[in-house]
Amino acid sequence: MHRARAILQAAFYDYPVDDLYSLIFGEEEDIGTEFIKGMGLAVSVRDEDTNMASCELDVSRLGLINGDIFGNCFDKVGEFAHDMFEAVGSLKIQQNHLLKWREITRLIGEELLTTAYVAKYNIRTGLCWQDVREVDCPWLDRALKDGVCDIHSHLNASYDAYLINWIGLMNQIAGKAYFFDRLEHPKDNPVVLRDYHFADLYSWCILAAKIRCCLYEYFVKGGKSEAWFMEQMEVFSELRHLTYYNGLVEDVENSLIEQREKSKSIYQRDDILDYAIEMNMTPALLDSPYAVLSGERRIMYSFLMAYYHGHFRHSKIIQLAYLYERIKTEFRKELVQTNRKTGLVNFKLYNSSKDSFSKQEKGLKDVMRAYGTQTSLYKPNCFLEGRFCIRDAEDFMKLQYDKGILSKKTLNQYNGRVKYVIHLTRKNILNTNRLEIGRRNAWKDEINAFLFMHDQCKSFTGIDFAGSELYTRPETAAGTIRYARNHGINQITYHVGEDYYDLLDGLRAIDECIRFCEMDENCRLGHAMAMGVNANNFYRQNDSEIVLPRQYYLDNLVWMIKKSQEEGLHLDVELEKWALAEAERVYGEIGYVGHFNMDQYYASMLMRGDDIFDRPGDGPVQRQLWAYLTNNRIIENGNMPITMKVRKDYIKQVVRIQKAICRLVADKSICVESNLTSNVLISNVMRYDAHPIVSFRKIKGRTQKELKVTLGTDDKGVFATSLHNEYALLVTSMMKKKRKQGYEAWYDQHVADFIKHLAENSMNYRFQEWQ
């Protein structure tokens, strides 16, 4: 790990808040030495290639600059930011440093680093810069100049849930214990350095709200003494011994009420989102959606200006400012995906947390939605296709995203650049009855609601099936999609091939989606990672063992054989014998009646997407299908896990089928929606340049049709990204791979042409308005 990044991660991400609090408020005389020891341990735990002694030696240099080790953490922030930015005065990241920047900001965010850079070098800019830094790459800007659309964006996860929720908390902290209780278990376990003291996240946020209030009074408003600051903080000296915080919350909330009332009086407005926002900024800045963040930035900017330029050196207040930033990062861990655990189950922990503080506060929810929409349209050449559930449709229709969040002024630049897609959610539990009558009826009701919305607003252009694909196969959606098509809805996108037990299972899901849902050139596939994931790497990462439900195992084996036959693929004789024997064995274990007949079983698989109530007959295929759909014993046995030992010839066959599925998608002119950061964090792809989007571009179908691919953000708030950032990360990773491998990788012009092609696809394959 890069040394500077390791220190920043240890200081602002790993160092336990409890231990930090004990140092600052405790009776330890030499807190610098204790802090250095803790930092050394934190660095060595994350960086396994470095021994403890060298870590402590490197960290000890923090205390050699001016003797204030906590202040020197802020010096490290400023130095690192200086190295990352393109030039003094620019807020663009150097392209060759983008991946370094991304690795640390994924953990601690961009706000502190950018604010430190602006303050340290006294850059004359407003406090309304974009929340995700752009990269200095002129030809990328040229490639996107003719228009680019984010066609895979879930609007309820597109806002900065961390910062906006944080600002809401820092302005009203009382009565929020319930919201913290609703958070899932900690997403990234802390490195425990000392004895752990009881103090939950809510209590730390109460402390942070008080520190923030004091920083604002001292550095922004002025006129307060250092003695006043410390007197205000005295009440927290025994925080770790408290079990109930009623008195503490009341004291802090009174301070916040006082600040809000002062702001209301000064600006003659009742709708003050943050007492720290300067509402008298220039109209252009006040119109910006990023003005919402300007109050938080203003406080830290004022502190860092005083610190960096030698106007302030009070060590205890510096320590409290550092503690404030560390608590912010601890809160951020709950809302932005920072851990490296893969799979949708992990992602859903973050996705469910993002609304924990805003569900009951409509004003804050409206701010978030407007922010997410406007920040997706930050440039005139940007377009958006936003997705949300039907229950949120009315709120989004009423949302005045064309008005400034703070200025309330109509901003015509957003008009006509937003279209809406309604997503129908799949359930997240294993089936007990595969007929799913209740879900099918619910989806039909949602289609009817969509048609009603479409009659009122033509910006509703299509439907999307989202949620866990592990538990709801494409067969369940087939009838709903037929119903939608019969009512004029032909623009459909389907999340598929993103989350799977076995790579072959993901490929089967894509094939079933195309077959059962009759996907064509008007449709798109969301993610479809299984089509391009490196099969050898996938099975190596899983130690050549796959755990999956018996029913999936049986279906995969049968489908592998029959799909290979249909596509004319080579199938090793020994592999086919093994697959048939395994299928027959598992068929019996699940409890199906009668002798295993692969042709009959596969015929029943092909009928799963049909409306079985309209299909006559009572033959063996129909009975096989009915047992699969309704027999509780078979369903229960089929859901039981089984472990598959992966053979080498099996992997080779998976690769052949991957290519066949890619040809199928290309032949049908179905567009694939790729989402770089989302897929890297959720799937088994660990590097940007290993993302399937890079291999998709090489695919040529049997009719020489090229596979159509786009790039989107998915959930840009949860992943702390932007559409421009997604393109920049892809460009940078591809170019770095070129430099590493020389002539065998991509030339700059190849990369430029590819990026332009992605942008053009995003405009050509976005859903259009229809009558």
Predicted regions: what they are:
Residues M1-Q771:
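Metal-cofactor-binding active-site regions of metalloenzymes
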